[in-house]
Amino acid sequence: MKKLIALLMAVMMVLGCVAALADAGSEPAWTEYDNMIATIKSTTDMAERVQLMHKAEDMLMDTGAIVPIYYYNDVYMAKESLTGYYSNPYATKFFMYADFGENTTLRLQLSSEPDKLDPALNSSVDGACLAANSFGGLYTYDANGDYAPNFATGYEVSEDGLTYTFAIRDGLKWSDGSPLTAKDFEYSWKRAAAPETAADYSYMFDGIAGYPDDLQAIASEDGKTFTVTLKAPCAYMLDLAAFPTFFPVQQACVEAAATPDNPGAWALEAGYVSSGAYMLESWEHNKSMVYVKNPNYWDAENVKIERLEFMLSDDDTAVFAAYQNGDLDFIDSVPNDQIASLLENPEFHIVDELGTYYVIFNVKSPMFDGLTAEQAANYRKALSLLIDRQYIIDTVGQTGQKIATSFLPAGMADGNGGIFKSAEGWSYPNGADGYYAEEPDVDQAIELLKSAGFEFDASNMLSASTPISFEYLTNTSSGHIAIAECLQQDFAAVGINMTIKNIDWAVFLNERKEGNFGIARNGWIADFNDPINMLEMWTTTSGNNDAQFGR
């Protein structure tokens, strides 16, 4: 422990960070966190890296802005005769090798209207699924969740781990038949990393030398190799090579329609050029999308399904009815009131995922006006302590989810050959693996609210002289609304008034991203199995920083 303390003190001295108690008003100072993440991404000492990631997790959770509810699992239904489809541990579903017997059309539902189809701009799970089936990267995942070559046939890495050279597959073509080469990767990676593109995931390129203005991701003159130079060794480099933000897009197609204000304009209607197993043939907004087999896909001979017909809806009841009526073959959502009756159904599937369902606070919200940073954090932590997570799992989730006591999920690797939650020399406040006990603690919640200036009467009900009232933002899926109602009930038990606002998926994503909320539902499924993925998203400049830290 003494060694750990000395290490952290040394890091703080090197960073020259200011104390992270209060910026101005109720917001937490965030420079220290940003610098900590930068150090984590640049260090070559992997044991030190693990300890620094634990320190960053402590800083993140101490804000109270992230309220973990449960660790995810995935629930879907598929006809028994449908085989060959698969999902990786990060919730991306692959249908290009699906086999449906004599059927060459697959009718399915993943979500409602997608927010963005440009792979560089997408940050939603449903968008990643669409991208994985219509675009491709250097690498992909096979049915076992292992890395598999895709547009690259292999790679070589330098002895110091800083240079990756990918061999590009011969004969690759875009869906319009034009050649796809390493130069398309160079253009696309530099575009996604560029500040003017405003990609939510642009920070993922930060580990590459020259980011963001002179990215060292260079194609050979003949377009047959693609060389990436890193700032520090990266254990998850192949995960990045398989991630949608790193998929190539055709420069001519992009530049024919994109504008400075809308870099993704080229992919707002059907007919754009893609590179994967399928291409978008038609799109009736807010209703349906039809993808057809891409004859120019490099592995087209192994693609059996000719058409993917998507129903665009997050109305669980309507989706389930369509499945029951035989109008859909695969659905990614099920009404909560049907789950108990489906648990023994062979068409009902529950798959573990590496992610967390949580509630997010906007630290810049007016609901924290007049409070110090410490009081605002205590306010948020108090609300977390009021939540009966097991009740939510038992009555809404119903599929064996585990209570989440931290944002980082159980089972996540530490990047150094171990499990992050079990790292030597570190302990969690709850004595187990997180920051909250599994049971609600109303008494402690009230004490924290009192420390933030709120008053309670003798029966532990909030005083009318210091009322608390706020709006909770969610999308229209029945499960999310049901969870919101559970929270509403828990908060009302001590006199807190919470109203619920539910809006369509694409609108919800943008409202949350823009910070137009005080408290909202959220969820994150890891993009790869390393804690940095769920820590770097909260840096000041990250496009996924929904809490608005440092802004």
Functional labels for PLM-detected ranges:
Residues 192, 281-292, 309-367, 390, ...:
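Extracellular/periplasmic solute-recognition and catalytic clefts
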Residues 77-94, 112-128, 151, 237-248, ...:
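A structural "hinge/loop" feature
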Residues 23-106, 284, 386-422, 478-488, ...:
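Detector for C-terminal structural segments
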Residues 116, 122-125, 132, 140-146, ...:
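Gly/Pro-rich hinge or "lid" segments in bacterial periplasmic/extracellular proteins
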